[in-house]
Amino acid sequence: MEFKVIAEYFDKLEKISSRLQLTALLADLLSKSDKAIIDKVVYIIQGKLWPDFLGYPELGIGEKFLIKAISIATNTDENSVENLYKSIGDLGEVARRLKSKQQSTGILGFLGTSSKESLKVDEVYSTLSKVALTTGEGSRDLKIRLLAGLLKKADPLEAKFLVRFVEGRLRVGIGDATVLDAMAIAFGGGQSASEIVERAYNLRADLGNIAKIIVEKGIEALKTLKPEVGIPIRPMLAERLSNPEEILKKVGGSALVDYKYDGERAQIHKKDDKIFIFSRRLENITSQYPDVVEYISKYTEGKEFIIEGEIVAVDPESGEMRSFQELMHRKRKSDIYEAIKEYPVNVFLFDLMYYEDVDYTTKPLEVRRKLLESIVKPNDYVKIAHHIQVNNVEDLKSFFYRAISEGGEGVMVKAIGKDAIYQAGARGWLWIKLKRDYQSEMADTVDLVVVGGFYGKGKRGGKISSLLMAAYNPKTDTFESVCKVASGFSDEQLDELQKKLMEIKRDIKHPRVNSKMEPDIWVEPVYVAEIIGAEITISPLHTCCQDVVEKDAGLSIRFPRFIRWRDDKSPEDATTTDEILEMYNKQPKKKIESPPIDESV
């Protein structure tokens, strides 16, 4: 299969703003792809060489080295390449223009590159894999030579998307949900197969692997798919409510209640003597927690399992729980063993999804928890999450206050009926989080996605000083604008913000972004931030839950303030539009709705 086919589709996808058209075009590409390498094609579409959970190195080519590779491949002076880049701000476009210039001047033949040669997907994939995996002395020069070799063979369009791929900036607007829908259309006979494909992906979060199974064994093979140790399961997510009475009613009157810890959610896999740890974003974080690997090996029983818990920093003297920020300090230390001594951790387990070749995601919570408790040996490091079973509001409140007093964020209330399965990759009412109220009319913070930026005035003139934020709508796989946040940032954070956003800047609005407001720059929906505000109000300026509460208006957060970045969350883990609506419906209503704020000021 020629790489040119993918490049031509990428070129079309880049210009589309409709998700339906995006999905249809992507399905067309998948259906025309070589089935023998369908997994590689899917990874390339995702902008990666392999799934994140494998923990393999990224390509590791910076702008300086890309410029050198383009210079070598196009026989152009490095300064000229750099000046052109400064002028247009897109290295992919720089490569395309310089390759086009080569073609028009006939220099390709002089360089010994035949225009009849075609770049194959296999060659691109294997060469870029070498680039990523090459380490040691002389590795940078080898990476540059390998990349320059590909660019020499590439036509202008191929060169553009090769460079963007290496940069990690494909800019074609494709999310995992779009790929899933496209796979269902291309291989499953239509949109009706989406649920089957999505379930398989939730159990094995590897789109390339799922695509390979479909083309080799058919869509029916996905129906019997089980979790596999080493491939993370997409985590089950909770809804949120701030009223204990309503929570208990929602879960049927009785529930299992766990502490909600202020730590890092972790999915732990074991097979024989191999142990893997994955973050909630499904990244392999095993190397960050050699102490946890040791604890799991020593204090759990079973040859093969997938369990879930929270890694929490604890005080080395008292054993009391520390905050999430303390855990982040540990991650920033270069000497991991020094970090283990300074920031020790405990693991609080709360679920079991797979054990000895049996899929437990389809079994009730009480069955899963009972088995989980049976495989943990008594010890001081790996424990079952603090929990009780409640059937009245008083006990729920009492346990909630106890969790807060001991350093927790609140509690997780979990349904315990026969239908209380593990809903991989889904957010539902089987789990509901109850967190402490903040000193604000909003009962909780929200996690929102950055979709655009606005330049400041005065001393911040010409620099980004505020952000357009969006909530995630899982029904449409889009990000709907909900506020413009300008407060809560330190000067240092604003300077860092400028750099972060310029790296993901887009020429046009991302096809998954739904916004009436026009920021000064559009960006890829990549970064998630925790935001607090005064209240949620009706606004004609924003698209979150548009036409749901009031015609031609959406919901917005009044007086939003930045709290912190949520690097542990993917954009799809952000607060959903339904959650924003739920928070709006639950907050005390004023007799007259507050007028919308002019956010253009």
From Swiss-Prot:
InterPro entries: ATP-dep_DNA_ligase (IPR050191), DNA_ligae_ATP-dep_bac/arc (IPR022865), DNA_ligase_ATP-dep (IPR000977), DNA_ligase_ATP-dep_C (IPR012309), DNA_ligase_ATP-dep_cent (IPR012310), DNA_ligase_ATP-dep_CS (IPR016059), DNA_ligase_ATP-dep_N (IPR012308), DNA_ligase_N_sf (IPR036599)
Catalytic activity entry: ATP + (deoxyribonucleotide)n-3'-hydroxyl + 5'-phospho-(deoxyribonucleotide)m = (deoxyribonucleotide)n+m + AMP + diphosphate
Residues of the active site: K260
Needed co-factor(s): Mg(2+)
Positions of region (Disordered): 568-601
Binding site for ATP: D258, R265, R280, E310, F350, R427, K433
Keywords, alphabetical: ATP-binding, Cell cycle, Cell division, DNA damage, DNA recombination, DNA repair, DNA replication, Ligase, Magnesium, Metal-binding, Nucleotide-binding
The protein's Enzyme Commission number: 6.5.1.1
Cross-referenced Pfam families: DNA_ligase_A_C (PF04679), DNA_ligase_A_M (PF01068), DNA_ligase_A_N (PF04675)
Record-level Gene Ontology MF annotations: ATP binding; DNA binding; DNA ligase (ATP) activity; metal ion binding
PROSITE patterns per record: DNA_LIGASE_A1 (PS00697), DNA_LIGASE_A2 (PS00333), DNA_LIGASE_A3 (PS50160)
SUPFAM superfamilies per UniProt: ATP-dependent DNA ligase DNA-binding domain, DNA ligase/mRNA capping enzyme, catalytic domain, Nucleic acid-binding proteins
This protein's record includes keyword Lipoprotein: no
Functional note: DNA ligase that seals nicks in double-stranded DNA during DNA replication, DNA recombination and DNA repair.
NCBIfam families in UniProt: dnl1 (TIGR00574)
Family, per entry: Belongs to the ATP-dependent DNA ligase family.
Protein name, per record: DNA ligase
Gene behind the chain: lig
